[in-house]
Amino acid sequence: MTEELTTVRDACARTLENTARTLHLGASGTEFVAAFRAMTDHWGAARPHDLPLSDVSPDGSPVEYAVDLGGLAPALQFAMEPLTAGVPARDPLAARAIMPLLAGRYGADATRWSALADRLLPDDAHGPHVSMYGAEVRAGAPIRFKAWFYLNVTGPDGAFNLLYSALERMGTTHLWPVVQAHVHRAGEDVPFLLSLDLSDDPAARVKVYFRHFAADVEEVAAVLKAYPGFEPGEVRAFCKVMMGGRRRFSDQPAVTCVSLLDAQTFDRTAATLYVPLWTYAEHDGEVRQRVHRTLAAWPEALYRYDSVLAGIAHRGLDAGTGIHNYISWQPGRTRPRMKVYLSPEMHDVTPPPLGVSQQHHLSGQTTARGRTE
């Protein structure tokens, strides 16, 4: 648990500064941290317990850091939830205010966001959260911004219909078959996030994230088998290593995402697997050992991971879980692409399955159904 001697904004900005320095991002890292400060200015002098519990990290912290573990040019990413002290996280006002800031100051493209905002950022949201925003940077490259919308804002059974409505508003209903094909188990393979790259680049992505409730590793591998490069044996092996030999995602569902446009062109890898790390290990030291096993063949990736982890962790790794959120996996031409997602852990160690902000809302089996049936 972080000592509440500084504000959430300052504490997380310092961690980003240190991580950017570790990754040798130079001036790009400085601009990146400045963007984080601008996007979190509305937090003001709030300390961790002044803000409502967030869904960004499982312990309720409103920030998550992510580092690409492959490639010569490392990428650093953050995600944040627009929150206001004393106001429920589902309130959309703070979320609506971020997009004009990004468009006006950084030239982010608001076209798709504007088509969706009144539908996906409602005043009477059913779920506990409505949106997240994030940014990613590499040395010498411009900052790329993105937004995530929660798909349960009209209720847990409305996710598919809301997603179809979102595609309709963007003029992309021709992509609906991609969503349908990704659902292998009706009522258990459930879309819960829609993300947009906030760019007018033709390659800007529209991604849908799915939770796969009570799936075993074979069922997850079967979902991903449809996408080039996802060999079922490799997916199963990766999951088993990161889950300590377990075969079923019994406590915390696996997550996959599909980039809808890429799924039709195959120019880029269309899918990503995310394995949750805080529920299938005794402590973060055990998670670190599993990451080491996965990265053993790539010493430069292992060094990058250890260096970043050392700068973010502020307690002994054997004290519990909660520093590691997820690890993602995609096939690559010469090696898999992996990214590790880490928490500032501003609240308690060892968060529960689904995270502290979702444990009651999602405590039962999700049974979202709709147009896929």
UniProtKB/Swiss-Prot annotation:
The active site is at E64 (nucleophile (probable)). Its EC number is 2.5.1.-. Disruption phenotype: Eliminates cyclomarin and cyclomarazine production and significantly reduces the levels of desprenylcyclomarin C. Accepts exogenous analogs of N-(1,1-dimethylallyl)-tryptophan including N-(1-propargyl)-tryptophan to produce the corresponding cyclomarin and cyclomarazine derivatives. Dimethylallyl diphosphate binds at Q77, K146, W148, R205, K207, Y274, R337, K339, Y341. Residues 346-373 form the FtsK domain. One of its GO terms (biological process) is alkaloid metabolic process. It comes from the Bacteria. It is an enzyme of class 2 (transferase). InterPro entries: Aro_prenylTrfase (IPR033964), Aro_prenylTrfase_DMATS (IPR017795). Keywords: Transferase. L-tryptophan binds at D55, V56, E64, R211, Y326. GO terms for molecular function: metal ion binding; transferase activity, transferring alkyl or aryl (other than methyl) groups. Dimethylallyltryptophan synthase; part of the gene cluster that mediates the biosynthesis of cyclic heptapeptides, known as cyclomarins and also of cyclic dipeptides, called cyclomarazines, which have both antimicrobial and cytotoxic effects. Catalyzes the reverse N-prenylation of monomeric L-tryptophan with dimethylallyl diphosphate (DMAPP) to form N-(1,1-dimethylallyl)-tryptophan (r-N-DMAT). This is Dimethylallyltryptophan synthase CymD. It comes from Salinispora arenicola (strain CNS-205). The gene is cymD.
